[in-house]
Each structure stands twice: as structure tokens, then as C-alpha cells.
UniProtKB/Swiss-Prot annotation:
Pfam name, any one: UPF0122
Lineage: Bacteria, Bacillati, Bacillota, Bacilli, Bacillales
Protein name per UniProt: UPF0122 protein lin1916
Family: Belongs to the UPF0122 family.
Organism of provenance: Listeria innocua serovar 6a (strain ATCC BAA-680 / CLIP 11262)
Function noted in UniProt: Might take part in the signal recognition particle (SRP) pathway. This is inferred from the conservation of its genetic proximity to ftsY/ffh. May be a regulatory protein.
Record HAMAP family: UPF0122
Amino acid sequence: MFEKTNRMNLLFDFYQELLTTKQKSYVSFYYLDDYSLGEIAEEFEVSRQAIYDNIKRTEESLEKYEEKLGMLRKYQQREKLFDQLEAQLTKKNFLDEQVKDTLEQLKNID
């Protein structure tokens, strides 16, 4: 469950602008704020089932966006490569402060 929550949070970070206001609200409450389905239903004055259905559809949408656009996958690949590069430079004692700063800037572009 923890892994799924982390994945949904990351997908939400990348694709939230593609969601409706209602989808953003429900997913934000559920995954980011850790509200229960009942608490969200009470907040929006709808049934628990309506919240559940909407969140499930939104999860499917987020996965479809990722399947087509691959933003999370590419981000994770870049992070892995940056970490490998940093480790290689450190191992060979090439990692001075200027190179370290440049790597950090590259990591933070997205």
C-alpha cells in the first residue's frame, strides 16, 4: 500500500493539471492529506461509494497519462543517472564543489 501511495503521489505531482478540479480535490485529500473515504464524502456531501469510484477512475487516468507520456519514468531514469554520475565522479575524486553545484542544478531543473 505504501508503494502505491508513493506512486500515486508522484503521478499526481506530474499530471495534476490534466485532472478536473473534483479529481484533484479527492486525490489530494485521499493521498496527500490521508483522509478516509468517509471523511472526504462528508466534506463534499456525497456518498462514500462516489468518492471511491472517482478516486479509482482518477488512478486509472493517472496511469494512462504515465503510459502515454512517461514523465515519471523519465524523471526516475534521470535521477538514477545523476546519482550514478555523482558516485563515479566522487570515486575518482573529480567531484569538486563547482561540479557538485552543477549536478544539483541539473537535478532541480524539473
